[in-house]
Amino acid sequence: KAMGFSNVRIEPFDMKTWVRGEESAEVTAPYPAKMHITALGNSASTGDKGLEAEVVYFRTLADLQAAPAGSLKGKIAFVSHKMTRTQSGASYGQFGGVRRAGPGIAAQKGAAAIVIRSVGTDYHRNPHTGGTNFPDGVTPIPSAALSIPDAENLERMIARASKSGQAVKMKLVLTPRQIGTTQSGNVIAEVPGSDPQAGTILVGGHLDSWDLGTGAIDDGAGVAITAAAAKLIMDA
């Protein structure tokens, strides 16, 4: 309204809602170590007592896809699928598949849970969350992302342990839950044209920030840019 748009309003809509709970991860054998982790959107829960199992390593999403059916029964799949650094960040879409599809594939292979390397290239211990999808008929499993330093540490542990025939075991505690339907809304504003019969031009952006971030980049900046573009049209 302060920018001068007309008929500014909120269009409510219902949406299924998932909320995260407690989150922790630690390697219990053979090299005990706590790790930084966060649940992926739509992850199932391990239960309050958590889940401890052997970790099976896959370098890429394709390697996970090639695993024999049932080969991961009762185990935790770990997929690295290291994202390539680019100036524009364009590789995010390509490497995001491990987050979107990996948990569903692991569930179909019989895995008890899955952890992935965070999709990103920054070396800090803030794991990167995001949504994941499970195909119809596939029961969701606990699914989470490790911070990049922790994912690389886990890779080193697995490589070292394999030389002596040891299995790496991890304990996960993830307690997210689905809380049913809640209400959100689209913010709509209009710039009346000079000819009502000429049709409508739609300018828009989305704000789908996850709870762990501010949404400044995805997509607060984009919303601000599109709003400014619409104002330029209005003021022309």
Indicate residue ranges for each PLM-predicted region.
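Acidic/His- and Gly-rich active-site-bordering loop/insert found
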Residues: 3, 8, 14-18, 39, ...
